[in-house]
A protein has these predicted regions:
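ATP-dependent adenylation/nucleotidyltransferase module used to activate substrates
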Residues: 1-162, 247-257, 264-276
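Short secondary-structure junctions
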Residues: 19, 201-211, 251-259
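Mid-to-C-terminal catalytic subdomains of enzymes
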Residues: 151-213
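Flexible glycine/acidic-rich beta-alpha junction loops that bind and position SAM and/or redox cofactors
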Residues: 172-184, 220-224, 267-271
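Short glycine/threonine-rich loop-to-helix capping motif typified by GTGT followed
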Residues: 185-191, 233-242, 271-276
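Short amphipathic alpha-helices in soluble, non-transmembrane regions
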Residues: 197, 238-251
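Anaerobic metallocofactor- and corrinoid-dependent redox/one-carbon enzyme cores
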Residues: 206-209, 216-217, 221, 243-247
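Short, aliphatic-rich beta-strand segments
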Residues: 218-233
Length: 276
């Protein structure tokens, strides 16, 4: 049964990740990729160790969901507190922001897995797009079983559905620092605002299938926020409906989001990479 549900390439890649004690150690964000890797490793009979980094750059709701998902798999995740805002050269790193942050965070994780191979959820698709954080992973010897097995998002979702893993259609919600331009270092209060506002949006019935990001794109206007909505996720929703939700958002988080506009865009990810 296992052979038919999980391709041999992925079985082999996970086996390569396991130590002598059959433990697979995973840097676990709680996103689809690392959650799938944990699920498959558990399904294949390995002991799974999950290391989850929590801090102001992560929405508290994301950490809570990551913990709940891990426990649903029968795994108690290890929570590691980290604050990227304390990295002195992060703001000056420019487009290498993710590299600097990941290098710092994964050094923390490696200190806790000195006798283990540390894995992450990088997938095949990540290899063909701009991902400066991958350089840090390569330098630190982080192992990516999904990428090695040739698994991209399509294969991950399809296999997750076959294995009856909950929420195989889970959408990405990257680090909150990505809501700000390169070179801008937000404070904790603004990160909390961003997380709370996005949580509020996700809870609105109209936003059930909406893909969006709340971004602060203009350093000269620190209180100007833009709600970026992916065009294909509108699924029959009119721009007027989205504007009405945005007005409720402004009222809920007044005065912090009084200067909020809505932008519908073809591609949601990589906004600041396209802008530079």
């Amino acid at each position: 049964m296992t052979d038919t549900l999980i391709p041999q390439a992925l079985q082999d890649a996970v086996a390569d990740a396991a130590g002598a004690d059959h433990t697979v150690s995973i840097a676990y964000s709680g996103g689809l990729d690392s959650r799938f890797l944990a699920f498959v490793s558990k399904f294949l009979g390995y002991r799974v160790r999950l290391l989850h980094v929590a801090g102001p750059h992560m929405a508290p709701s994301e950490t809570a969901q990551a913990v709940a998902d891990a426990r649903a798999m029968g795994i108690e995740p290890e929570l590691i507190m980290a604050n990227p805002l304390g990295i002195t050269d992060l703001a000056s790193a420019g487009k290498n922001r993710c590299y600097v942050c990941k290098h710092h965070v994964f050094m923390e994780l490696l200190a806790r897995t000195t006798d283990k191979k540390l894995c992450d959820g990088t997938n095949k698709d990540d290899l063909s797009v701009y991902r400066p954080g991958r350089k840090a992973l390569a330098e630190l010897g982080i192992y990516s079983p999904l990428a090695k097995a040739g698994f991209g998002k399509k294969e991950i979702r399809a296999t997750a559905a076959k294995l009856e893993m909950p929420r195989p259609d889970q959408a990405a919600r990257p680090c909150l620092l990505t809501r700000f331009p390169y070179g801008v270092m937000p404070d904790e209060a603004t990160l909390k605002l961003t997380a709370a506002a996005e949580d509020w949006l996700e809870a609105q019935p109209e936003c059930a299938h909406l893909r969006f990001r709340l971004r602060f794109p203009d350093p000269a206007r620190p209180y100007h926020a833009e709600l970026h909505v992916e065009e294909k996720s509108l699924e029959g929703l009119s721009k007027a409906t989205v504007d009405a939700v945005a007005e409720r958002l402004k009222a809920r988080f007044a005065p912090d989001l009084n200067d909020l506009t809505v932008r519908v865009m073809v591609k949601l990810s990589g906004f600041y990479d396209r802008a530079n």
